[in-house]
Amino acid sequence: GGLNEVFADVADLTGKDNYLQLARRFSHREILDPLLEHEDRLTGKHANTQIPKVIGYKRIADLQGDEGWDDAARFFWETVVERRSISIGGNSVREHFHPSEDFSSMLTSEQGPETCNTYNMLRLTKMLYQTSADVHYMDKYERALYNHILSTIDPVQGGFVYFTPMRSGHYRVYSQPQTSFWCCVGSGMENHAKYGEMIYGHSEDELYVNLFIPSVLQWGKVRVEQLTGFPYEEATTLRLSCGKAKEFTVKFRVPEWSDASRMELTVNGTAQPVSASGGYVAVSRKWADGDEVRLTLPMSLRVSTLPDGSDNYSFMYGPVVLASR
C-alpha cells in the first residue's frame, strides 16, 4: 500500500485530523494533478508504484467527501482498465506502463502483466464499487479474478507467479520456497485468501449476488448457501435458511458476457419473470426456510481485442479466457 492510504487509515481509526493532513501531504501530486484534469501521463511509469498511490487518493476522498479526488481515482481506473489492460485483466510490461496505443511489447516480452498490479487494481475496484454499486466494476473484477489471479498459484507446489507472459506458447515461472520472495509472493498470499470478499453485497433489505462462487453467507439471521459449478455450469442456485420468514430482495448481477433475455429465473422450481435493471435481475418476496432461487447464466464464445486495435485476439467463453494445449 501507499503511505497516503496508511495515514488515512490511521486518521479513520483515531479520529485525529492531523493524520488526514499527513495523508494529503504524502499524496504524490505529479501523479494526482494530471488525473484531476483527466490526463493520462502514465506511459513509462512503474505501474505498481502508481496504483497504491491512487488507492490512497480514493481512501482520502471517501473520508473527506472530496469529489475531485474521487473522480481522479475513477479516471485512473478507467484509463488502466479500458486502455492499458488485456483480456486477462492484467497490465504492464516489465513492471511499467507501455504506450497505450502500442501493445506489441506485451506480446513479445517474457515479463508480461505483473500479479501485484492486478492485486492492487482489484483493491481499487472494490473501493469504487462500494461507492457506486456499478456492475461494470464487478464485471472487470470477475475477469481479473478468474483469468489472472486464480491462475497465479501453482496447484501442486503452491508457488506464486510474478509475471504472466502474453507471448504465444510461452511459460510462467513459479516461486520456489527457499529462493524466491518477490513482491508478488507477498501479495500472492493475500490474493488466494480473498476470493470470498466480493461475492456478495447488501443494503438494508437487498442482497446482491455479484460473483458465482460456491459459498456460505450469514447475513443477519439469514443463511445463504450458493451452489454452483460455475464456470463449468451455466447456472447458480441460492438456498436460503431464514428461520422466521423474512421479506427482502435478491439481486443477481447480469454479467457483461451473458444475455439477460436468455436468462431463466426460478423460485422453488417455478419460473419467474426476468427483468434486468441497473445491471441486476431482482426477485422480491417473503422468503421462507428452505427456499431456493436459481438463475441460468447463458454463455457463448466471443472474441476480445486489444485496446490498440491491432490484429491480435483472445477467445473467451463466458468470463474465461481460453488457452490452447
Which residue stretches match the model-derived regions?
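Glycan-recognition and catalytic cores of secretory/periplasmic carbohydrate-active enzymes
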Residues: G1-R325
